Amino acid sequence: PVSQDDAEVYVNTAVLSIEKSFQNPYLAAGDGRAENEFRVGEQVNYQVTVNNLQKGSIARNLVISDLSLPEGLALDGAEDAVTVSGVPAVIQNPVAGTDDAGNQLNPENYKETVEKPVSCQVTRQGTGWIVTISDLPYQTPVTVNFRCTAQESVNGMEIVNTAQAYADNAQKVKDSSKIWVNSPVLNVEKTTDKPFYKYGDIITYRIVLTQEQTGCVARNVTLQDVIDTQGVRLLKDSVILMDEKGNVADADVQINDD
């Protein structure tokens, strides 16, 4: 007689995806900044979303991290600076199943599962963080939100930092985002062509405006000068704007009596 017996195995190779982004609420101010542009002292709110794209699989011992933040954009010190959402409380975990008699088929014992609690741990390390999740089933996206504050030491820098994720049964994936910290530092120096004048002389003023912070760009700059001394009047059409090479530059010049 022909005998048959069955055995069940669980092939479990997860496929991870990762997406890193940031939010810039300061765009609402309408100050002409770019989407990825922040000022010194402003908060940068990052999001990292990791998902398991392989149907039927469970990513085991998933590790998500972002350890590439510079000192000037380190994770904030508050306890809620890192939060994790989307982690399931429990999963249905495949098991070997019920022992059955040999030399026969037992389809009623196929695909047995047990309920398994899912653990999630958040750890600070260096300037960043590590999140460990015990199990991540198919199409169960989890999101790590974390908050940093731009410091003076990174002013003028474009900061690219990278988040990554891997599991015991999934290859490592990475994603990066770039922000620019742009807090210009303006300097104004005003001089005259000579130290003394007599009645009827023409006084020639020279105002040099510079932006001193490397890597920064000042936008929509307004330079204003008011003559406070009685008896001194501004000559119409005498205001000329020149660039650093001495070439006359276009500008919106508004001239009043003083």
Regions found by a protein language model. Name each.
Residues P1-D258:
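Exported/extracytosolic protein signature
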